[in-house]
């Protein structure tokens, strides 16, 4: 929770960076937040296929500053053909992506079906909504406002015949 502010400032999650190896190697001052929205699969070692037509990358400074480095990096990605924006609240963007993962990953893993087929089941669709609602409440408790409702978030992915990476990993024995 570096550059987070409030009572969470400086708290660590050792499970995410055991021994703070990445933190020491990269440093907080050189860290940019980022969120990727893309339906991808590993075709072979070192080869990733992107199947979504609406892929995008969102970057942002941890403290919300609109820095020259974030803008410059976003422009470089755009020049390379990847839609990219700079967010004034990257932490809320991360929460938004996490909400998608909360709904899609576990349910698709349990059913071993893609998102579209999983969410076509009314019971599973309802479970996904509940997971996102719980995530929204947790984000709000952490002071983060996610821009769309649970229904809107589920509707965005409900028609996608994509298998989340956690299901792809299971199917490949990883």
Please provide the spans of the model-predicted regions:
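Short beta-strand and adjoining strand-loop segment in the mid-core
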Residues: 3-12, 20, 46-74, 125
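Glycine-rich beta-alpha junction loops
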Residues: 35-40, 63, 90-94, 102
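Rossmann-like NAD(P)(H) cofactor-binding subdomain of soluble oxidoreductases
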Residues: 1-44
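Short Gly/charged-rich anion-binding patches and loops
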Residues: 17, 72, 134
């Amino acid at each position: 929770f570096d550059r987070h502010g409030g009572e969470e400032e400086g708290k660590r999650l050792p499970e995410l960076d055991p021994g703070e190896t990445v933190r020491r190697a990269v440093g907080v001052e050189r860290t940019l937040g980022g969120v990727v929205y893309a339906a991808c699969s590993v075709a072979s070692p070192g080869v990733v296929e992107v199947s979504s037509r609406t892929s995008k990358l969102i970057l942002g400074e941890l403290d919300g500053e609109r820095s020259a480095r974030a803008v410059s990096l976003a422009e470089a990605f755009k020049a390379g053909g990847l839609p990219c924006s700079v967010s004034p609240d990257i932490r809320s963007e991360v929460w938004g992506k996490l909400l998608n993962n909360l709904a899609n990953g576990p349910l698709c893993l349990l059913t071993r079906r893609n998102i579209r087929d999983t969410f076509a089941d009314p019971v599973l669709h309802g479970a996904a909504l509940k997971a996102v609602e719980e995530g929204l409440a947790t984000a709000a408790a952490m002071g983060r406002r996610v821009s769309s409702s649970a229904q809107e978030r589920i509707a965005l992915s409900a028609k996608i015949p994509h298998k989340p990476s956690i299901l792809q990993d299971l199917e490949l024995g990883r």
